[in-house]
C-alpha cells in the first residue's frame, strides 16, 4: 500500500515537474526574446552614438593628420578669389583664409571648383569649406556656418549709355547672372520683375557675363555689388550700378553640415584677426575701406 502511495506521489511530482519545466522553458524563451530585443535596441543606440562620435573623431583626425585647410572657391570671382597676373590664386577671401590657416598651424590650399558643383565637392571631402563671397541668406540650414563677416547686396549692372536707370527699365531687356548664384536665387524671389525681361540667361562666371555686356549680347547683369564695383573699376568701362538693389545679404564661410570643430577654430581665428586689425588691413588693401562686420 505504502509502495502504491509512494508511486502515486512520485507520479504526481513528475507531472508537476514536467509542468514546471514546460513553464520554465516558455518563460525562458520569452525572457530570451526580450533580452535579444533589448540587446538589439541597445546595440542600435550604441551604434548611432558611435557613428556620431566617429564622425566627430574623423573630423578631428582629418584636421590633425592632414594638417591642411582646403578652401573651395570660384576662380572667376574677383576680388574674392581669382587667378592673379602671376598665375597664383589670390583675392580678399583667399587672403583671409590663408591667414587663418597660418594661425591654426595648417597648410593652406586654394582649390578652384565649379560653383554649381560646390555641394558635391564639400560632401565628397574634396574641400573643407566654401570661402568665396558665399551668401548665407537662403542657405542657413544647408551648411554649418561661421558668423557673417561681410554684408553684401545683389544689384544690376548696365552700360552707362543704355538708358536703363531703374529696374522698371529692364522690361524687354536681356538679363544675365551666374548659374546657381545668389543673384539667380534672388531673381527667383521676384517673378513679377523677371516676367518683364525679354530673357533671363545664366553663365558659368561673371567674367563671361561682363564680356557679354561689353559686346551688347545682354543688357544687364545681376550680381554681387562687391564684385560689380571691383569689375567696373578694373575694366575701366562705362558701366553703372543701378541704385535700386535686388536683395540684401551676408557672406559667411560654409562648412559641411556638422563640421563644428573646424568651424569653431576658424571663427575664433577670424575674431582674433578682427581684434588685432588684420581684417581691417586686408579689407583696405582690396576695397580701400574696412567692409568687414566681425566685432562691429
What label would you give each PLM region?
Residues 117, 133-142, 186-189, 214-215, ...:
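A ligand-binding cleft/hinge motif common to bilobed small-molecule-binding domains
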Residues 98, 102, 107-169, 240:
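Acidic, polar ligand-binding/catalytic clefts
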Residues 75, 151-158, 225, 229, ...:
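Periplasmic-binding protein-like
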Residues 94, 109-121, 200-215, 249:
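Short helix-initiation/N-cap motifs at beta->coil->alpha
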Residues 75-78, 89-102, 134, 155-207, ...:
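Bilobed "Venus flytrap"/periplasmic-binding protein-like clamshell domains
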Residues 94-103, 161-164, 173-174, 179-182, ...:
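Extended ligand-binding regions for polar small-molecule ligands
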Residues 18-33, 40-48:
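Bacterial lipoprotein signal-peptidase II cleavage site
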Residues 61-133, 276:
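Extracytoplasmic small-molecule ligand-binding "clamshell" domains
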Amino acid at each position: 500500500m505504502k509502495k502504491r502511495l509512494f508511486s502515486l506521489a512520485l507520479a504526481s511530482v513528475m507531472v508537476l515537474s514536467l509542468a514546471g519545466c514546460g513553464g520554465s522553458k516558455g518563460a525562458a524563451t520569452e525572457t530570451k526574446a526580450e533580452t535579444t530585443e533589448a540587446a538589439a535596441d541597445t546595440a542600435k543606440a550604441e551604434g548611432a552614438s558611435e557613428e556620431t562620435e566617429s564622425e566627430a573623431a574623423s573630423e578631428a583626425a582629418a584636421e590633425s593628420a592632414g594638417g591642411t585647410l582646403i578652401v573651395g572657391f570660384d576662380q572667376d570671382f574677383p576680388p574674392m578669389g581669382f587667378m592673379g597676373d602671376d598665375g597664383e590664386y589670390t583675392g580678399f577671401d583667399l587672403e583671409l583664409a590663408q591667414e587663418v590657416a597660418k594661425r591654426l598651424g595648417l597648410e593652406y590650399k586654394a582649390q578652384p571648383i565649379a560653383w554649381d558643383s560646390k555641394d558635391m565637392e564639400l560632401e565628397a571631402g574634396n574641400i573643407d569649406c566654401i570661402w568665396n563671397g558665399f551668401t548665407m541668406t537662403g542657405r542657413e540650414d544647408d551648411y554649418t556656418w561661421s558668423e557673417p563677416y561681410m554684408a553684401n547686396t545683389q544689384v544690376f549692372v548696365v552700360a552707362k549709355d543704355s538708358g536703363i536707370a531703374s529696374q522698371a527699365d529692364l522690361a524687354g531687356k536681356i538679363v544675365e547672372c551666374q548659374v546657381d548664384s545668389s543673384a539667380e536665387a534672388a531673381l527667383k524671389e521676384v517673378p513679377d520683375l523677371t516676367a518683364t525681361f525679354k530673357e533671363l540667361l545664366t553663365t558659368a562666371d561673371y567674367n563671361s557675363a561682363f564680356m557679354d555686356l561689353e559686346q551688347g549680347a545682354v543688357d544687364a547683369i545681376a550680381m554681387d555689388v562687391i564684385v560689380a564695383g571691383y569689375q567696373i573699376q578694373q575694366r575701366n568701362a562705362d558701366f553703372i550700378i543701378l541704385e535700386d538693389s535686388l536683395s540684401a545679404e551676408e557672406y559667411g564661410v560654409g562648412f559641411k553640415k556638422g563640421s563644428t570643430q573646424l568651424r569653431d577654430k576658424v571663427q575664433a581665428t577670424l575674431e582674433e584677426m578682427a581684434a588685432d586689425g588684420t581684417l581691417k588691413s586686408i579689407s583696405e588693401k582690396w576695397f580701400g575701406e574696412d567692409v568687414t562686420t566681425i566685432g562691429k
